C-alpha cells in the first residue's frame, strides 16, 4: 500500500518559504544602498531567524519590495514604494508611511496593508482576500479583476475602479471616476461621494441595514473614516446582464464567478 503521509510526523500548515516568527523580535533595515532584490533577501533572512517585526528605512520608491511574504509579520516601510510593492502576500500586516506606485498588493491572499498617502493605478489588482487600505486617493483600475477581500479608499478613486471584479468589496469615501464597476461579474462597491459614471452592467442597489453595520465595523477596524456617514453611501453591484453563458459552459460560468 502506498503511503502519502506519516501520522507520527508533526503536521505542517505552512507554505514552503513561510516561517514561524516572534512579533516581539524587532529589527531594522536601511534600504538606501540596497537593490530591491537584496532588500527582499534581507527581509526573508530575518524572517528565517524568527524576527516578527521588521522596519525598513529609506525604501526610496524602489519597485517590488516586500513581495511573496507567506507568513504573519509586522512590516513597516518608512517612506514610499514604487511599482508592484507588497505583491503576492498571504498573512503579513504592512504599514507604508508614504505613497505607492502601480499595482500595490496585487494578488494579495490575506493580511492587512495600510498606505498612509496616495496609491497609483491598479491598486489591489486581482486580490483574493485581506484588507487593503489607502488613506489617500488611488488611481485608475483599482480593484481590477479582484476575487475577494476588501479595498478601502479614504480619498477619491480613478476611472474604471472595480473593472471586471468578480468578488469582494470596495469602499470609496470620496468620489469615483468614470466607468465605475465596468463589466463587473459580482462583488459590491460602496461610494461616499459622487460617481462620475457607471460602467457597463454596473447598477445602483439599495443600501441595507446589514450593509451599514458592516461598513461601520470595517471602517473602525481600518482606522479610517471615523466620522463618515455610512447612510449616505451609494451601493453599486453587477446587473448580471453580461452573464451570457450558453448551456455548454456550466463549468466556465462556475469558475468565473
Label each PLM-derived region with a short phrase.
Residues 1-65, 135, 159, 164-257:
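Intrinsically disordered, low-complexity terminal regions
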Residues 44-53, 64-73, 84-92, 103-109, ...:
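Beta-strand repeat architectures
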Residues 72-80, 92-93, 111, 130-131, ...:
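Extracellular/lumenal glycan-associated surfaces
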Residues 57-59, 78-80, 87-90, 97-99, ...:
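Feature marks extracellular polysaccharide-active and adherence modules
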Amino acid at each position: 500500500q502506498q503511503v502519502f503521509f506519516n501520522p507520527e510526523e508533526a503536521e505542517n500548515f505552512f507554505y514552503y518559504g513561510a516561517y514561524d516568527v516572534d512579533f516581539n523580535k524587532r529589527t531594522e533595515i536601511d534600504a538606501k544602498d540596497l537593490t530591491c532584490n537584496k532588500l527582499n533577501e534581507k527581509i526573508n533572512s530575518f524572517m528565517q531567524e524568527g524576527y516578527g517585526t521588521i522596519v525598513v528605512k529609506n525604501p526610496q520608491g524602489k519597485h517590488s519590495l516586500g513581495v511573496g511574504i507567506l507568513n504573519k509579520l509586522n512590516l513597516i516601510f518608512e517612506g514610499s514604494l514604487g511599482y508592484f510593492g507588497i505583491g503576492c502576500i498571504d498573512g503579513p500586516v504592512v504599514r507604508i508611511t508614504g505613497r505607492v506606485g502601480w499595482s500595490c498588493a496585487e494578488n494579495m491572499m490575506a493580511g492587512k496593508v495600510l498606505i498612509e498617502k496616495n496609491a497609483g493605478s491598479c491598486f489591489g489588482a486581482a486580490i483574493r482576500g485581506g484588507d487593503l487600505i489607502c488613506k489617500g486617493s488611488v488611481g485608475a483600475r483599482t480593484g481590477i479583476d479582484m476575487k475577494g477581500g476588501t479595498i478601502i479608499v479614504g480619498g477619491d478613486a480613478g476611472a474604471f475602479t472595480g473593472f471586471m471584479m468578480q468578488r469582494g468589496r470596495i469602499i470609496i469615501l470620496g468620489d469615483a471616476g468614470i466607468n465605475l464597476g465596468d463589466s463587473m461579474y459580482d462583488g459590491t462597491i460602496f461610494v461616499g461621494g459622487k460617481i462620475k459614471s457607471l460602467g457597463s452592467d454596473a447598477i445602483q442597489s439599495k443600501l441595507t441595514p446589514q450593509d451599514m453595520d458592516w461598513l461601520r465595523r470595517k471602517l473602525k477596524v481600518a482606522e479610517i473614516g471615523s466620522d463618515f456617514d455610512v447612510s449616505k453611501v451609494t451601493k453599486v453591484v453587477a446587473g448580471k446582464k453580461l452573464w451570457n453563458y450558453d448551456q455548454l459552459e456550466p463549468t466556465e460560468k462556475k469558475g468565473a464567478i
